């Protein structure tokens, strides 16, 4: 009798954890998807206002040719550092709002890609990235194998990638640029799986609803960055230039 009660209690607890995990991960993906939609809307909106009859409008000149372009480029970086620094001291609702502001700023920053690549190739690469991301994230969620070792290796790879990009600013080597793009795709593909598993494991810590909400936001931000960076590297490889 006692054994049956214990088994019943264990099964009920496991079911509750499973349902809670699904709800938590769904929240992460919902925040991420909303942020991506906002990024796309802002990028296309600015591009629409910046280009007329194949030439830059005054708004386009302001955002892409004036010193304001550096604010547009660097604002997302400043925002992500601000969110990371303030995450512990702000509410989950404010963290969510800051994340969406960051996504909007990223859209303004990425709008210049629509000046470089054809709209058709941008859309095509976006769907390639989305399909790849989905498969990799599902793998990270379902695999029983720990990816922590892979994650440490990939994070070191990110630093190497940054150094290579800085070096190539001075070398302007098309061959090195191609290698950077290939390696970048591989690194952020791996990080998508690793980060998904890490975000999933974060759920199992006993947290209050406010902390869980913040974890959901930081998880969405992490996967959002994986997606955006993988998209940019794939676009460099597969995009058709104007």
Feature locations, PLM:
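A hydrophobic alpha-helical transmembrane-helix feature that marks the membrane cores
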Residues: 1-242
